[in-house]
């Protein structure tokens, strides 16, 4: 079984335009058309059983629309997180609605949403997500949308669980996209989950393997950041790390099943 914990897709009407825009910003190719149908086609071809969709509310006004879309496409193959914007006046109400919609967690992107992960004004958001048992997946490290400032540095991410010990926190991109030294220093060995998305493009194999060993297979999630990377690319990297069958199963699906309450 294979669960990709970090997938992006969009409504059919805007998928092509959105991917072209993001591709120009990131100077990165994409590997699906960004629609539900083409993402499922890609998953079938790649051997991905379940994709965990991670939408981003880039504006406060987008919360409800994005979460309604996520709820409308959710099925046994696509399990969706919702998203809230920290600056929205109704952010707390929307967290409760995410739970009511049957979505599986909350995606936050500090760079797109223009906040720092340790900003005090996020306290109620973290506290409410913890109380509702909603996992949070954070973009961490570099992002081309704000190249001059890393809004989710590993050191700040590592501090969040100290205040919210029951919050399930997932740091995308090995804890810091293109900022792996600090991720290794501050996040590796913590109780924060780390997803491996985009590691095949940017993370040195020796460092990747070292981080996997030191963090532990029970806190690592297989992920791609589809459509910006593929399951084949990330699996080729993972396969170069000497893991037991149990450890690989944990990374490829077991930890995800636990977070998603599928076990």
Specify the residue positions occupied by each region the protein language model found.
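Active-site gating/metal-coordination segments in enzymes
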Residues: 49-50, 60-144, 148-151, 202
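Catalytic pocket-lining loop regions of alpha/beta-barrel enzymes
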Residues: 104-105, 118-221
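Active-site environment of divalent metal-dependent phosphoester hydrolases
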Residues: 10-13, 58-61, 86-90, 113, ...
């Amino acid at each position: 079984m294979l669960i990709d914990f970090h997938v992006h897709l969009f409504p059919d009407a805007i998928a092509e335009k959105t991917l072209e825009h993001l591709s120009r910003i990131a100077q990165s190719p994409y590997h699906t058309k960004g629609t539900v149908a083409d993402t499922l086609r890609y998953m079938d071809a790649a051997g991905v059983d379940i994709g965990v969709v991670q939408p981003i509310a880039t504006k406060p006004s987008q919360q409800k629309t994005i979460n309604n879309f996520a709820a409308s496409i959710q099925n046994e193959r696509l399990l969706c997180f919702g998203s809230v914007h920290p600056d929205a006046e109704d952010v707390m109400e929307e967290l409760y609605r995410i739970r009511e919609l049957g979505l599986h967690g909350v995606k936050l992107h500090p760079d797109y949403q223009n906040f720092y992960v340790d900003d005090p004004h996020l306290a109620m958001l973290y506290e409410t997500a913890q109380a509702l048992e909603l996992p949070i997946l954070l973009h961490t490290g570099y992002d081309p949308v704000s190249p001059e400032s890393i809004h989710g540095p590993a050191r700040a991410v590592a501090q969040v669980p100290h205040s919210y010990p029951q919050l399930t926190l997932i740091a995308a991109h090995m804890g810091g996209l293109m900022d792996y030294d600090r991720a290794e220093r501050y996040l590796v060995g913590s109780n924060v989950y780390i997803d491996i998305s985009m590691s095949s493009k940017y993370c040195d194999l020796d460092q990747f393997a070292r981080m996997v060993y030191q963090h532990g297979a029970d806190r690592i999630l297989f992920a791609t950041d589809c459509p910006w990377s593929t399951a084949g690319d990330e699996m080729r990297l993972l396969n170069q790390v000497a893991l037991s069958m149990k450890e690989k199963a944990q990374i490829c699906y077991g930890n995800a099943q636990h977070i998603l309450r599928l076990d």
